[in-house]
Amino acid sequence: MSKRTSLAAAAVLIGTVLIAPGSANAGPPGGGGDGVQNIIPITQILAFGQKVTAVAVEYSSEVNPRTLNRDTYTVSDSLYNFRFDPVEDITDPTKRADRTITAVYTNDTPDLNADRQSDPGKYVIVELDSTDPGGNTVMATGNYVKVNPDLQTQVVQNEDVYAQPAKPGQGRGPRLAAASDEAYRPTRPAINLLADDFVYERFTTTTGTMIPYAYHLPDGYDAARKYPVVVILPGQGMGFNGSNEGVQVAADIPATAWQQEKWTGTSEDVIVLAPQNQRVGSAAAQADVMVELLNTFAGEFSVDQDRIYASTVSYGSTLAWAALATYPGLFDGALITGGFAASEAQATAIATSGTPVWITHGTHDHLLNVSTTGQASYNRIWNAYMQLGKTPAQANELVRYTEYADSAFYEPDRHLAAAPTYEDETILQWLLAQ
């Protein structure tokens, strides 16, 4: 085996020993160093959801970055993906793989540096290839999903790690931690980039129904300004089950994309509201709860009442269709991804109100057949415009449709049309323009 320990292989062949940081790997007597102090996963939300994309390794004092390289560490993780795999795979030692390390540098906080260059500090940041299959944080729990509270990330320090020398540039400094084949597990909660910036609260309707929700205000939020708001309506499994609060932000990209110009292609400030309905009662009843929350929220924050938008994933479309039909004029535009079908009555109501809608769907969606859902919704709304006397050109401006071939999905979940949809900034800019 190479100097760089293959952690996934070691776990299967000999059973990797897992230890608590600070209990081993200390330097020799008189050599300084107290070993690894903490392991802190760092997560990001990508097109197909949240995953570990870096690890912060904390030492007792400032680390000498000149002694570090990508072979200094091995990071492995579970290959489990809630979209495809049984939940038992999470802890199966045969269902693990080493991650690809893309950068190693020091920092004074457990955070990423955009330039991937070292700053003086006691944290070593180990960045990982986000396209690796391992490191997903969301897990199934019955018919729902939640963020896994016990991430399976493991770190091995393959080479000695040294402190800064007493005189800069002279030697490598005292040893902080000796090389070892022992694996470290996370010792502190993950740092969840962007997801941790949301505020997570609960709202109770006038009829006593409780709904958790998350929201994000733009940096430098100014109550004297008016901001567009995008309401994220998540899939069935992201509904609230009593113990999975906040997963509607982590499971898919829509909630966090609006804070990132690399996704939207615009620097415009946007408020995001992400309700997490309990999956009880009809879609219409759930929509009523969501609308009461939205109206209350819009009254408390500086929302542009002419720029309220809905963006849905899968089952969230049923709430959007119901709200668009029942509360005409509430939403100024809607983006329906991988959704259920709008009924004929809903299509007529939507066309009557003239609310612009863009529908996207995967050609080979394995859960919702495209011909009876995405295509049907588009055709019903378009035909309703024809019945109301609109020209084809006018209808084409008010209802749009995009269908994605398999090649548009970098993970083989053709149901999650939100992934390729949100990778197309022109669609997001269209929504904000309504």
Where do the model's predicted regions map?
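A domain-start/cap signature at the N-terminus of enzymes
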Residues: 27-54, 70, 77-227
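Primarily recognizes the serine-hydrolase "nucleophile elbow" in alpha/beta-hydrolase
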Residues: 299-300, 306-351
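Gly/Ser-rich "nucleophile elbow"/oxyanion-hole loop immediately N-terminal to the catalytic nucleophile
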Residues: 220-225, 281-314
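The conserved beta1-alpha1 loop
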Residues: 228, 233-235, 338, 361-362
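C-terminal catalytic histidine-bearing segment of alpha/beta-hydrolase fold enzymes
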Residues: 347, 360, 364-368, 372-375, ...
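Short, proline-enriched alpha-helix->beta-strand connector loops that line the catalytic pocket
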Residues: 268-270, 351-357
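Secretory targeting and sorting signals
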Residues: 1-26
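Active-site machinery of serine-nucleophile hydrolases
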Residues: 229-291
